[in-house]
Amino acid sequence: VFQVAERRRAQLRELAASYGRGPDVRSVAVVGNKPLDPSPERARAVDDCDLVVRVNGFRLDDEGDAPTYGRRADVVFFNRALRATPWFFAGYRDRLHLLVEPGRLHWEPDSIPAWWPQDLGQVHVDNDDLTIPLSRDLGLDSTAEGLWATTGTMAAWWARSTFPDATLHVAGYSFVTEPDQTRWRHASGDDCIVGPEHRIALESALFRSWVLDGRTTIWP
């Protein structure tokens, strides 16, 4: 079983790298969806990475925009509650879409929304490879408690654990400085509540702990 899981994770790593700049991934950017002020330095740091990961209803810089969010999206983490933005399906055939399914541990049906493109080609990420070990790092029990990390934290944890020798650039995560918030504000689209299944103060602490080893940068 262990060998099967290792092979599955290795295959996903190779697949993800094929959507970036090359097989040798030495830098990864993971961008969440909080509203950001323009920053040419941050946008350049994101777009200069070997692999750029986005989350759910993400936003990209368009032609003529002040550099803020960056313009690349190689891998997209998302869930069935997706609120698609104008950028999500634009050029979707050139991206790897990774569908996280923590709710399948309890109540979520194994169905695909009819409004998604039939050729989206999403890869379903095994909970044994992502949800459960990440929850363990957070001190949560997803199987017994019905609690799990946000999709954004899943994306960042996956990037960090899948490419352990790469530098990690993280931007767009409001809970790093606002761990007690109860609503999400988004770079595009309406705000919404923080789901009751999340414990974002624990996620905030996890992100801040990553900075200590010197290979993770959290951009304001």
Where are the predicted features?
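Metal-ion/cofactor- or nucleotide/acyl-coenzyme-handling active-site neighborhoods
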Residues: 1-220
